[in-house]
Curated annotation (Swiss-Prot):
The gene is hemC. PROSITE patterns: PORPHOBILINOGEN_DEAM. It comes from Campylobacter concisus (strain 13826). It comes from the Bacteria. It catalyses: 4 porphobilinogen + H2O = hydroxymethylbilane + 4 NH4(+). This is Porphobilinogen deaminase. The porphobilinogen subunits are added to the dipyrromethane group. Its cofactor is dipyrromethane. CDD domains: PBP2_EcHMBS_like.
Amino acid sequence: MKEIKIATRKSILALWQSEHIKARIEAQHKGMKVVLEGMKTKGDVILDTPLAKIGGKGLFTKELEDSMLKGETDIAVHSLKDVPVVFPEGLRLAAICSREDTRDAMISEKFAKFSDLPHGAKVGTTSLRRKMQLLIMRPDLEIISLRGNVQTRLRKLKEGEFDAIILAMAGINRLNIKAEVAHIYTFGFDEMIPAMGQGALGIEARDEKQILDETSFLNDENAVIETTIERDFVSVLEGGCQVPIGISARLKGDEISIDAIVGLPDGSEYIKDSLKTSKDKFQSVGKELAHKFIEKGARELLKRAEEMA
């Protein structure tokens, strides 16, 4: 191929991610032209409604997928946590890139630690997964929906609308915004379990051999192992991107540490488990853990969670 067209959202973070992949492809394939095609998704346009209430899968991916299926673009760069586990016919996950920090973080102008937040503090997040885990730790908090790009969220924090907001450490690091905020508290995995695929970039592409061959070098073995477990877990539970599911797999040497949680958005009921396993079990352990959760009532919890959202 002489040219690859990348479908990308227009947010600053999405453009950073796409520029990063563009540079890697150009470095790998000398002389290849790589073009970014910016577009808005449903999730970018509807900003006055919590994501869970908009409904449907692929809120941040469908328009990009449509452009690939029409042949207007060849690949799309996504935050893997936004990518549904089932792909439209003709598309597939071509590569999973090395992961950034997978953890969630609390950003605040006044409070250095999560435990410093006063009773009834206002915390901004749209994620039901984050809301659930915040309320499990601190039922007194007032969790307020917060939509928009990272800059919009930071502006609202600085204007005093919130005592704290929750962001992914990956986005904080990629946009290099640590100097812009007073306090960053990073949650441990025992406090807040991330979303499937958090911190990884996923390359979606048309299911054509030439495109897949040109992008295969982007795959990172460790990221593939970890996110396979996480995506298998969510796939078996039949959970979308907007339901309260946390799953984190972390590979160190030949050992994988896994933490998972499923529950109601208000934190009143949840199922949580942790385990360690060997690297060679990565293709089965996510599914097995999901079936254990199902035996404990996870699917019923998720149905109730969708009704509450």
